[in-house]
């Protein structure tokens, strides 16, 4: 599938491999409000992305979109040296601290992880960036300038992600990361 997407992207971009952007879209319309998304790329697919100098890999999961830049793809290839599994799932809010629960409220919480086939997990990339966009439709009661992305730490505390912001045009909360963790949409009081 990935090889087909790369070939399609090359044709669409007139063979300009330097600016090649590959997009994988999950058909979430049938799933409605999905609980789990799982993308497995074998070692050949990861190698092909790096070999073709793909500028970015976009993984569109409906509620959550991840965009890996070329440095992140190279780092994943280097770190995993095998197949790569990208997982996005709705997280359980039971583990949130009381304070985090107030910040997050009924807003979405997701777990992101990247593992190799041998269950080796990547938590932080040494190089590269991942742009994350989480769908969220702000209510009229919420001040859009107070909506941010929060990292949920191992104690259930919510830590605001620097540079995160709400985009009212796309109705997404956006941030850039080097790591994989539990993230939530929250609103400052």
PLM feature spans:
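A generic structural signal for beta-strand entry/edge sites
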Residues: 21-23, 34-36, 54-56, 63, ...
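Short aromatic-centered micro-motifs
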Residues: 39, 59, 151
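Self-processing/autoproteolytic domain segments and adjacent N-terminal interaction modules in large
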Residues: 51-127, 189
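Proteolytic cleavage junctions
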Residues: 103-189
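Extreme N-terminal export signal peptides that direct proteins to the secretory pathway
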Residues: 1-54
């Amino acid at each position: 599938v990935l090889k087909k997407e790369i070939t399609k992207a090359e044709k669409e971009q007139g063979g300009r491999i330097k600016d090649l952007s590959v997009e994988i879209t999950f058909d979430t319309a049938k799933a409605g409000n999905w609980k789990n998304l799982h993308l497995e790329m074998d070692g050949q697919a990861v190698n092909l992305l790096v070999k073709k100098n793909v500028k970015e890999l976009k993984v569109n999961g409906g509620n959550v979109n991840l965009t890996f830049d070329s440095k992140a793809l190279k780092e994943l290839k280097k770190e995993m040296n095998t197949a790569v599994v990208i997982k996005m799932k709705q997280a359980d809010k039971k583990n949130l601290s009381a304070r985090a629960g107030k910040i997050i409220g009924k807003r979405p919480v997701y777990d992101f992880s990247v593992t190799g086939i041998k269950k080796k997990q990547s938590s932080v990339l040494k190089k590269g960036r991942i742009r994350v966009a989480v769908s969220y439709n702000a209510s009229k009661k919420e001040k859009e300038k107070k909506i941010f992305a929060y990292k949920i730490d191992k104690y259930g505390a919510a830590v605001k992600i620097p540079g995160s912001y709400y985009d009212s045009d796309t109705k997404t909360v956006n941030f850039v990361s080097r790591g994989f963790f539990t993230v939530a949409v929250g609103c400052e009081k």
